[in-house]
Amino acid sequence: MKAIELIQSNVPPVRINEPIEKALNWMDEFKLNHIPVVNNTEYVGLLSDEMVYDYNNLSDSISKINFIGNQHFVLENTHFFQVVSFLSKFKLTIVPVCDDQKNYKGSISGKKLLDIFCGQSG
């Protein structure tokens, strides 16, 4: 099973020009510690709740946050077990999926990966 087949549509990315508060609200709503950030279709990086709390100004645009070192993603043809390994290695709650031009395709939550691993992918 490839990453592109595991994408969930219920967790939308936030846009680079949106307020940081919106990202934090979505993380809370979806019970995640990370959320993908995009600029149109281009993947920018993975915003963590820790980055938000360190920044400490929720009304600012997400574009004010430095994403260097937080650009974790897998390619769309990455195998399921490699996606699980990636999630574990970087201690993520969600894994962004991109094509080879870094266009954002969607994301896979840790819960979804665990459900599949346990055979409960319904």
Model regions: which residues?
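Histidine- and aromatic-rich ligand-binding microenvironments
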Residues: 6, 19, 36, 51-52, ...
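Short hydrophobic beta-strand motif reused across regulatory alpha/beta modules
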Residues: 44-50, 93, 105-113
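The conserved cystathionine-beta-synthase
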Residues: 13-31, 38, 73-92, 97-100, ...
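Structured N-terminal alpha/beta-domain signature
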Residues: 49, 63-70, 83, 96-97
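Generic amphipathic, hydrophobic interface segment in small proteins and small subunits
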Residues: 29-54
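A short, polar/charged loop-to-alpha-helix boundary motif
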Residues: 51-66, 113-122
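ATP/adenylate-binding site constellation spanning eukaryotic-like Ser/Thr protein kinases
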Residues: 8, 40, 49, 58, ...
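Bateman (tandem CBS) regulatory domains
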Residues: 1-11, 59-71
